[in-house]
Amino acid sequence: MQTPPGKTLVVGASYVALECAGFLTALGFDTTVMVRSILLRGFDQDMARAIGNYMTTTGTTFIHDATPQRLERQEDGKVLVTYLEAGEEKTCVYDTVLFAIGRYAVTQGLNLANAGVEAESNGKFRVNEQEQTNVPNIYAVGDVLYGRMELTPVAIRAG
């Protein structure tokens, strides 16, 4: 990055989104997190609220029940963000917008159906405790697992 990010909007409420927002705030940048529904989906919500409260006390701003609708680059290079917050249209200008809205499994091109591997509609696989798919000699680990936490340490430990 050749220039500092300045006033930043982080769209998303995953651990990656909050980690990015946290370090940007710690570096002194005005940082806002746009949350569609809840922080840290899939995690303990008491802990998620505690993390959100802590981040608020350290300077991160949160916009809850919000979704971006339109982004427009202004002549000065800043980004005008139009969003809905609790159904009401609002706007704000940011220097940088970071989308951290999740991942999806890109498994369709692997032709695994020919091997008999069954995938969910989102491309992810159900596995047993040993990370075996429905085909005993075919395994899956990491972010392609259906219903599992998408955490790097979990994937590393598995395989």
Where are these regions (language model features)?
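Rossmann-like dinucleotide-binding cores of NAD(P)H-dependent redox enzymes
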Residues: 5-9, 15-88, 149-156
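FAD-site-proximal beta/loop scaffold in flavoenzymes
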Residues: 1-5, 91-158
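Thr-Gly-centered strand-to-loop micro-motif
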Residues: 11, 18, 41-42, 58, ...
